[in-house]
Amino acid sequence: MDSFQPNCCSEHEELKVVMLCAPSKLDVPDLTIAENVGWDATVNHVKAMDNFMGFKTTLENAGVKVIDYSEELSPDVKTISEQLINRYFVRDLACVIGNSMFYGAAGSSLRRSEYPHAHSLLEKWFPEKKLNNLLLL
């Protein structure tokens, strides 16, 4: 992964680097399962991946460095991660305020297994940062 230092002093400044995660490889064809995850509709993996790639390409075309953290996982962790149906949203995994980085905490039990994967990558990428626990709502 390219080296950079996380820094954010305003939510209105230009994005330079963002962390995304590709969608799960699983469909969510049942509305009950979707509602249990907090969604209001079912999910088709192919459509979700097309939307993700379009979003990623748009950011890259605007000059933003995009890190897909699913590409950085070890093979065994990646196998597990690809089966997590609610890993689309990375905004609450961690945040940067100034030069400090803060861990997020899963607001739903359905997302708890995703957090250690992302947090271990952040620790690897930024060992000098003291990552603090913070509940991001």
Language model features with spans:
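The feature marks the mature, well-folded catalytic cores of soluble enzymes
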Residues: 1-137
